[in-house]
């Protein structure tokens, strides 16, 4: 899988964070929407425009003009949540609404560790890492090749919430750290909608067509019959995000293959529910329903 990092170099990221300490982020929103996004969509260098348009046209079922308009909105919202992430690094805070967090608190007081599956809808990083229940150490699986400034910002935020980063490595050594965390009855958070490292997938019905979800997260969960929560964070309005926490049940007495398929199906159903409710915040800019070897165009 091709791995891409957040747009811009370290100097640009540093200046943006410094600017956001003093400038209302709405000015940067408008500049990005009007000056940057139209150029990016016109050039379409990473094919994100094409993939987004087909998503709205074929999977959501919109007309041609409506699909084109929502492709623009989708890219503007993506830029907005990226800016919000840098605003968070600059020390700004957002109002967080929560739904279903009682499931998280319940699992926090059980002996075993558990998994939290995120996805590329909304912006998990703005609020999801604030869900750190007492009594258990929290480990977040992150892409290890990100720009230094992004990793520094993450580390600062994570240290405030007692979170340990597990960077994804080409040599797959992160799997040992995941295993160690779960053996120690800790929490591990990871995205479950994008293939990273291994090419093994589970074909699952998603938005009316078979999609290939990575088998890794579901294999980790079912190996120990762990409890799993789907956690997604959606941008509701300016300065406000909403956290959705949903338990993903599966038959722990079934065969390993059946357990993985059941868990992938439950995850896909919850993801589809949110995607249909907030289609403009779907940020998997590649053909999610193509051959399993298709490569994402941006992270």
Name each model feature, range by range:
Residues 1-118, 155:
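Membrane-anchoring hydrophobic helices of lipid-metabolizing enzymes
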Residues 2, 109-110, 133, 160-161, ...:
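Non-catalytic C-terminal accessory region of glycerolipid acyltransferases
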Residues 96-97, 121, 147, 168-171, ...:
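A conditional alpha-helix N-cap/helix-loop micro-motif detector
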Residues 11, 48, 96, 170, ...:
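Soluble or luminal CAZymes and related metallo-dependent hydrolases
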